[in-house]
Every structure is written in C-alpha cells, then in structure tokens.
Amino acid sequence: MRFLAKLPLSWVRGFAALIGRILFVLAAPRRRVVEKNLLLCFPERTAKERRALARESFIYFCQAWLDRSWLWHAPRSVLEKRLKLHGAVQELEGTTPTIIFGPHFYGLDAAATAIGMSTPRLFTSIYTPLPDKRLDAWITAGRVRFGDVKMFNRFDGIKNNLSGLRAGGILYLLPDMNFGPQESIFVPFYGIQAATVPSLPRFARLGKAKVVPVIPRMTPWGYDVEVHPAWQNYPSDDVEADTALMNARLEGYINTMPSQYY
C-alpha cells in the first residue's frame, strides 16, 4: 500500500476499477446480496439500472480500499489537494460536544481524515477489532494519523467516548448498523422495519451533544466531504422516533449516491 501511495490517483483508481469489475463477476454470493438490497430499497428502478448500481458499488468499494494507501501514507500536501472539506464547517469549531453522524459511505475514512486534519479538538470514534492483528494495527494507525484522534473498542463500553464528548470533543459515530435484536430497535428504512442501533440519540442525550451529519462523496480528484448543519431539536425524549428520523434522513443522503453506500 505504501507503493500505491506514490502513484497518480488516476492509476490507483483505474487499477481498483479493474479489480471491482472482476469481483463483480466472481463474487457471486456478495453480488446477490447487493442486488437484493437494491431491489428492496429501489423497487421502482429497472433490473438493468439496479445491476449497474451494483457494479458501480463493487468498483467504488475497491477504489475506496486502495485509496487508503494515500490517505494513510501519502504526504499531507497530497491529502490537502484531494480532500475538500466544505459546508457548515463552523459546526466543528468551538467546544460544544459534537457527534458526527457518519453513514457507511465508502468515503467514511476519507471524511474522518479530513476532519482530523482540520480540527485541534479531541476526536474519538468506536471500532470493532479485526481478527487479523496486523491488518487491525494498520487500519488503527491510519485512522489516528492526523489530529488528536483516539479509537475505542466497542466492547469496552461507552465511558471513554462519553468522557470525550463531555470534555468538548467530537465523536465520529457510524450508527447505521445492525448488531442483532438485543442491541437494536425496529424502525422504518425504505419502507421496511429494519433492526437499527439507537446509539445516535442515546449518545446525543447522554453527552448533551449536537448531531452534525458529514457526508463524503468519492470524486475523480479525491473526496468531497460536506458538513451539514446540526440537526435542530434532536434528540427528543423518544428514542424510537429519533432513530426513525435518523433513518429517514439517511435515506435522503443515500438517494443522492446509492452506489457509494454499503
């Protein structure tokens, strides 16, 4: 990966696109899962359109994975040219406890890197350790490369992340997950009752934090990372309603680029 970091971005993206097209053909079980999800979420689209989205998704996945070569190993000057952080960036300033709502778009690590490069604030996140210790160490090192970043194991509880929030820090949270019925509630997602982790409203309430969506989009020149205004009157006293609202707004973000979401 260090070698790839030295190559022009167009070369890295082109190589990754080739791998993505090959995997789309060979990884049939995964392809069927993607196509099934697209059918559930976008039944109004034709089979041809959904298949094209599925193929694009495989390509974006491979491109985002190889992009981590330069995200985590290229000089800062290279990243400054390829990462465009814009929008309501003032939401990341000050000392108000802040939760970044970071949906699972392929550019999630690019977004985190862009924020880490731009703020002196404590910046925490939650991760699930990988079985491969070397891969886990490489990913963790990449994610803490810039800024005052700390990664906390989700199996160690929420105390460290809450402490960071209450101290005026930022929590990068990816709550659009399904960890099973014991940790989830069922709320609508594209018209289907989906098991959803209610961590966003709970962290916001416990940390007295505002919620700021940050949406990354892969572009030919790198990543466009848009900071949205903080949600108003969030959270409420109703965790289920707050989680349903999160899913509803997530649908809006996904609809702008469905092939970049996973």
PLM region descriptions:
Residues 6, 41, 118, 145-146, ...:
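Alpha-helical structural context
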